Amino acid sequence: MGRSNEQDLLSTEIVNRGIEPSGPNAGSPTFSVRVRRRLPDFLQSVNLKYVKLGYHYLINHAVYLATIPVLVLVFSAEVGSLSREEIWKKLWDYDLATVIGFFGVFVLTACVYFMSRPRSVYLIDFACYKPSDEHKVTKEEFIELARKSGKFDEETLGFKKRILQASGIGDETYVPRSISSSENITTMKEGREEASTVIFGALDELFEKTRVKPKDVGVLVVNCSIFNPTPSLSAMVINHYKMRGNILSYNLGGMGCSAGIIAIDLARDMLQSNPNSYAVVVSTEMVGYNWYVGSDKSMVIPNCFFRMGCSAVMLSNRRRDFRHAKYRLEHIVRTHKAADDRSFRSVYQEEDEQGFKGLKISRDLMEVGGEALKTNITTLGPLVLPFSEQLLFFAALLRRTFSPAAKTSTTTSFSTSATAKTNGIKSSSSDLSKPYIPDYKLAFEHFCFHAASKVVLEELQKNLGLSEENMEASRMTLHRFGNTSSSGIWYELAYMEAKESVRRGDRVWQIAFGSGFKCNSVVWKAMRKVKKPTRNNPWVDCINRYPVPL
């Protein structure tokens, strides 16, 4: 059983090493077998520089909160032992200039603090577009639409069918019907038509829910990775809703499925420098424009997973919105691994040998994704984990650092653990080399993981030690809507709201990853109990059927 579990995480690759130059096998071709993990145990190795980075963020935010209690304690200790008469006597002993100067410095310091501290950013509400039923397809209908287009041979269609059966995607996802066309659908006209449908659908719902007029929006950020026309999608939104001329608009492209959190981060920065403003963030992807019509299996995979979807989020930094906001933005941590060549090319848009454009998925994707995820959660940990978990983590880290047994076991970690598991023996040296895995359930009540695929979600659950309930929103979103790219984490939050599981004070962790390779996290805190929606929620008509087994 132990060996089976170990092998499940491994993949093999035959590497051609060329012609043997010397020895008994001179002149013969040689090969080697490289063994890789599907998704590395990213919590089994910790880079201290990312732990340090997390504490750097924490100190930057908490320096004032740590200083003020100390000053209050010192002042209380000095004044607490004096009677009222003694206090007045001491004040009378000082001249007027000293007293005025002291209070002047105090007031100035308080003003500088309140003026320089980051403004709170609130999430007023959000909307997720639900396409019409004419776009709904089952897995069998999806294959038939692809066959009807006449662009795929039976071998490619069979490969698509096998991928879909193991994907975790259900029979009610949405695709543009144009994928069945024998003509070229990756045109600007087709892309604009799909973009206007999903973006305006989400924004109409958002403006209805928040009762904010489009002209009152001061910041607009639109992210779409593949489809980037001129004029931009943000300009298309401004034109459609006749927004004001001095709006700060941004259009993010080519940043993959994690771009939604990047857009939130950009909107937050804009709100810090523009008081009393609303910001709208739109996240989407165009399925038809990204449709690949070749036979390269590594480029066919995105066709099987990506589905129609769009989210629109209303943010505000106005203090009066504190009362009716749903969530407050707590933390954003971004990780970018593009400096590494393997990470940079793990998801890569290019043409195949026949000249057909598409996204190529590298065999290294799971490995580089795990590394990016490890870096991100290591940086996020000090900001969100309770002090008890941080103490246990550092105790385990010190034990691994200074224990000779841990150092020895590190060099032979794979062989030792494999042998121990095979023989059913618990290895003490392996225990020393294994770091303490923090319990993230103590830091968050709700988890929204990017629903990339069933396998990815299973690996995340295992490595983070999460329960089925923690993963429910991500799995059900994958089943009902498929991979909607950067908007997927909002469909997951909408699922939680439809289940009435979000209560005042709850912390929500959204995490997404995409090309580059990037992994980004955002943490929200619920400002109030979110009531079950009766309309304007993509889950309203089907929430009673969920969860379902995958």
Curated annotation (Swiss-Prot):
Tissue: Mostly expressed in epidermal cells of floral and vegetative meristems and, to a lower extent, of leaves and coleoptiles, especially in young tissues. Also present in trichomes and phloem. Expressed in siliques, seedlings, flowers and leaves.
Phenotype reported upon loss of the gene: In additions to several malformations due to organ fusion, plants lacking FDH demonstrate an enhanced cell wall permeability, reduced trichome formation, and are female sterile.
Keyword Transferase recorded: yes
Gene3D superfamilies: 3.40.47.10
Any one Gene Ontology cellular component term annotated for this protein: endoplasmic reticulum membrane
Example of a GO biological process term: response to cold
InterPro entries: 3-ktacl-CoA_syn (IPR012392), ACP_syn_III_C (IPR013747), FAE1_typ3_polyketide_synth (IPR013601), Thiolase-like (IPR016039)
Effect of G256R: In fdh-6; constitutive postgenital fusion between floral organs and some leaves, which result in malformations including abnormal ovules development
Gene Ontology molecular function: fatty acid elongase activity
Resulting phenotype, G514D: In fdh-3; constitutive postgenital fusion between floral organs and some leaves, which result in malformations
Domain FAE: 113-402
PANTHER family in alphabetical order: 3-KETOACYL-COA SYNTHASE (PTHR31561)
Stated name of the protein: 3-ketoacyl-CoA synthase 10
Native organism: Arabidopsis thaliana (Mouse-ear cress)
Gene: FDH
